[in-house]
Design a protein with these regions (language model features):
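A compositional/biophysical signature of low hydrophobicity enriched in polar/charged and small residues
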Residues: 1-171
Length: 171
């Protein structure tokens, strides 16, 4: 387990994307700070400041602003297996009608780690992390399929996690 800064389309798991214009564009210094934290979320502000040309206090202020704006989170990233979650799956969902109410219902479920609206074969893709197969079955069969508007689901159960990283930088 280690800490990383996760700069994402929506650092707030229930909030709107910071890429939809709700936040001003980031300058090169803020992007460099994010990259430093993606490498090590516990990196001292003084070390970041040295790398990006700012004082420790200025880095602290910028990091707080990035957190407050929902541009990034600083989180501990774990291997789900090591903390008791032995079953992960991606679930493709087709919806009748408006996607938002279904996406909102999925977002409220603690087992749903990612909920994305997509173009293609599925309207929504949801990553689910569960304790075991029985838990996964309960989430899909009794909870997801019971959401009004869900027309169909297709599950893609993970057999082996080969890579999990949040090091995409700030391209």
């Amino acid at each position: 387990m280690h800490s990383e800064a996760v700069a994402s389309r929506s650092a707030d798991p229930k909030g709107p994307s910071s890429r939809n214009g709700s936040n001003p564009p980031l300058d090169s210094v803020s992007l460099a700070i994010i990259e430093q934290l993606q490498e090590d979320g516990r990196r001292p502000y003084a070390a970041i400041g040295k790398a990006v040309g700012l004082s420790e206090a200025a880095v602290r202020q910028r990091v707080q602003k990035l957190l407050d704006q929902g541009v990034m989170q600083i989180v501990a990233v774990t291997d789900p297996l090591t903390v008791g979650f032995r079953r992960q799956a991606m679930v493709g969902i087709n919806v009748e009608g408006d996607l938002d109410p279904v996406a909102d219902a999925l977002t409220a479920m603690s087992e749903c780690e990612y909920v994305v609206m997509t173009a293609g074969s599925f309207d929504l893709m949801v990553e689910i992390v569960c304790e075991d197969d029985d838990h996964l079955l309960e989430v899909i069969n009794r909870r997801i399929r019971a959401i009004p508007g869900v027309r169909s689901t297709e599950s893609f159960v993970y057999l082996k996690l080969k890579k999990q990283t949040y090091m995409w930088g700030t391209r």
